[in-house]
Regions:
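Short N-terminal helix-loop-first-beta-strand/juxtamembrane motif that initiates sensory/input modules
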Residues: 44-53
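Beta-lactam-recognizing serine transpeptidase/beta-lactamase-like catalytic domain environment
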Residues: 13-15, 55-103, 108-283
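Short, basic/aromatic recognition patches
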Residues: 32-43
Length: 283
């Protein structure tokens, strides 16, 4: 690589013989088996896969498709960057692609309701397949009626009508503050090139925007990497570890040059809140 810890005299000897000195070796946190499985599972779909180790922040797998062959990027450059090429293979969809979070955002809608209401377990709503406020209606998938549910059951069913009604119960300003704490509208704690996710809901936006946002639609945009970080924090008792992909650097003879250690970013939620969400996600 760009630097080497080969002994000085060895380097001089290599120079005199017209040979290149071996560089250091970088060992990543990527798990080959997981990386290969994620790559194959994504197939020909456009999308991304991110796998993290919650307790350390190690990035175990990261896939973005469509992809490209780095060995032939010079020859392929013109086709990769052509105006009529809609694949955007040079975009790392895992860290740079911004998408509506959809039902994954119900994690945060749930967390906000729990934080605002100590009696959250008592909330129930009878789903008839849709929820209407004024001229605006939110439908469940296939207009399915889920019946009477509590929060835990509605989370498991991913009931849009329930969550639209739940959203109307929230303090929008506090919801925005929660999303700020969850790193929306901010740089993620990573050295990777990553886009900022956005949460822009305001009280003045009205019921239609509030309902849509509560089910992960509306104007909210997020990267797959960001959502993986949030789920990782939930699985680590509310604590987010800084994600990293470099495990260590070794010299050409295998001597350890530098070891990268896990580092805590901060607490995103209480241990109790994380336990509730883990329970809901496993229901």
């Amino acid at each position: 690589l760009l630097r080497s810890n080969t002994a000085f005299l060895d380097k001089v000897g290599d120079e005199m013989q017209g040979e290149k000195s071996p560089g250091d070796n970088v060992v990543t946190t990527l798990d080959y088996g997981l990386q290969a499985t994620a790559y194959d599972a994504l197939g020909y779909y456009k999308g991304a896969v991110v796998v993290l180790e919650p307790a350390t922040g190690k990035i175990l797998a990261m896939v973005s498709k469509p992809d490209f062959d780095p060995n032939t990027i010079a020859e392929d450059w013109d086709s990769l960057t052509a105006d009529d090429n809609t694949d955007a293979a040079l975009l790392n969809r895992a860290t740079q692609g911004l998408y509506p979070p959809g039902s994954t955002f119900k994690i945060l809608t749930t967390l906000e309701y729990i934080q605002e209401h100590e009696d959250y377990e008592n909330y129930s709503y009878t789903c008839t397949g849709s929820y209407t406020v004024g001229n605006h209606t939110i439908h469940c998938y296939g207009n399915k009626s889920h019946g009477t549910q509590n929060l835990r059951q509605a989370f498991a069913n991913s009931c849009n009508a329930f969550y639209a009604s739940l959203g109307m119960e929230l303090d929008v300003d506090q919801f925005g503050q929660l999303c700020d704490r969850m790193l929306f509208n901010a740089s993620l704690p990573t050295d990777l090139q990553a886009s900022k996710s956005s949460f822009v809901l305001k009280k003045s936006d009205g019921s239609s925007a509030i309902m849509a946002t509560s089910i992960g639609q509306g104007q909210t945009l997020v990267t797959p990497f960001h959502m993986a970080l949030l789920v990782s924090a939930i699985n680590n008792d509310g604590v987010l570890m800084k994600p990293y992909v470099l495990d260590r650097v070794e010299s050409s003879d295998g001597t350890l040059v530098e070891q990268y250690e896990p580092e805590e970013y901060g607490t995103l939620m209480t241990t109790d809140e994380a336990e509730i969400l883990k329970d809901y996600m496993g229901y």
